[in-house]
Structure formats: structure tokens, C-alpha cells
Amino acid sequence: MDNKRTIVVALGGNALQKQGEASSAQQQRVAGETVRQLLPLIQAGHNVAIVHGNGPQVGNIVLHEEAINTADVPSLPLEDCGAMSQGLIGFWLQQALHDAFASNGIDRSAVSMITQTIVDSSDPAFQNPTKPIGPFYSEEEAKTVASERGYTVKEDAGRGWRRVVPSPKPQTIVEADVIKSLVSAGVTVVSTGGGGIPVLQDEAGQLKGVAAVIDKDFGAAKLADLLDADTLLILTSVDAAKINFGKPDEQSLEEVSVAELQKHIDDGQFAAGSMLPKTQAALSFLAGGTGRTAIITSLEKTAEAIAGTAGTRIKS
């Protein structure tokens, strides 16, 4: 097809886990529903790479690890838990894609890939944890958990309290060339889960995991840049980014320029930990080249957003 695009899709947490549905079977069902919403992109002939968040899952894995921590069965560090979440969620999405392809007669393959993202050891994020992971707590519960386990806790966009961990910016993705080759060949690749497993690289090129969780929207933006993708599609729980959110003059943003979006960011229109990183990630992708489009919308509006009739659309 003449208008075939390379699209990197960033899935929000709501695309994998709904409130009160945290079991494996429930999350696999949600993954299947999510894939069905993405299927029209693949049926249209686009090459698609999928990046997913892992905040709830990695936090729950950490809790499981701490619950069984003994001298004989020591708990795993945060970066290992991130790798476990990539394998787990990658399996759910890869299987859902396989089944959807089989059911719809689509001659495509899907694969999930453990992905490492290089970060900078001097990133100030290591001194200021901000990335929420794990379950929501009341303020009282959060302070108890913080005291008992040594966590840093913060309120998460008015939705409750959660543990927060360092969230350094991605510098590059180790497996990007392999992902690019697969995507170019028409394989639907699930990668860079949770923004990628954060690793440090020494002067000899050796890698070592570090305790952090990268924001998946920044990870998706970095992957999209390295793939030289046409479109970065950031999916969240709302149909579009909004200014004056919750006020009488609330307004959904449709077509917006880079300069306009930057001004809204500078004016404090977007909440940290919510819409702010999505808009910042969109701009970081657009800064990497011309002819690119970033879209922010809901999972349900995916097909309409790609067609240009829904969501917030920003072009370079």
C-alpha cells in the first residue's frame, strides 16, 4: 500500500490491567481486547511496534519477591523484576496477537523481545524518585508501607498514593537495530516494555542493570526515533490531551503545532505523572526528524486517530 507507515504504539496501563482485575487470566483477557483494537492498523498494512507500560505489574512482582525473601530464596532486584514483567506482558500480548492473526486470516508474525535501555548514571532522576509503581494506597496505608519497607511514596495524580522509584531518561536502546529489522520485515514486535530494562554502560561497553523504571512513553519515543517511525501513537485513558482540565473552559486539543504544545507545557497545563510525560515524549520524538506525527488518544479511538479524525495530533 502506498501509505504504509511504521507506527510505534505506546500502551498505557489501562490497556493491560483494569481496576480490580489483577489476576493473570484477567490481564490476558484485557490484552486480547487491546490487541483487537490495534488489529485494524495491521490489517491496513502498517508495520507496528508495540511498547507497553509495566507500572502495576512490576510493583506487584516486587511485592511478591519481598514476601518470600529469605536467605535461601533472596528477593530479586528491581531491574530483574522489570525483566520479569517484560517477559510476562510480552507473552500475553504476543499470544493475543498470534490468536488474532489466526482468527482473522492475517499472514503476519508477532514476537516479544527482552529490551535493555541505556541510561546515564548522572541522571538527576536517581536523586528524585518520581515513577509510580505497584498498587494504590490510601495516604495512611502508604505512610505505613514507606515506614515498614523503606519506600518513597507520593500521591499519584489524585488517584491515591503509590511507591515511586527513579525514572531516568532513555539514552538509547540496545536491541533497536534488531527490532528495526523485524518491524521492517512486517513482524509485529512487542518490545521496550516498561520503557526497557534500565542499564548502565561502562567504558568497555559492558552493561549492568540499575534499580529504576523508565517511563514507557519516553521509551516508546526513543524507540520510534531509532526506528525512524512515521507515527508515535500514545494511548491513554482519554480521547485527547486537554487544556484547562476540569474547568468550565476545558478544551480538547486536536491539531496542534510543536510550538503550541510546548507553550501549554510551559504554562503548566498538564499534570506530572499523567499527561505531562506523554506530551514531552511526543515532542522528543518529533524533534528527531521531519515528516513525523505524534498522536495522543484512547485505545478505543485508535483507528480514527490514525485516520486523522480523533485524538491530539502534533506534526514535525
Regions found by a protein language model. Give the residues of each.
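C-terminal catalytic "cap/lid" subdomain
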Residues: M1-S316
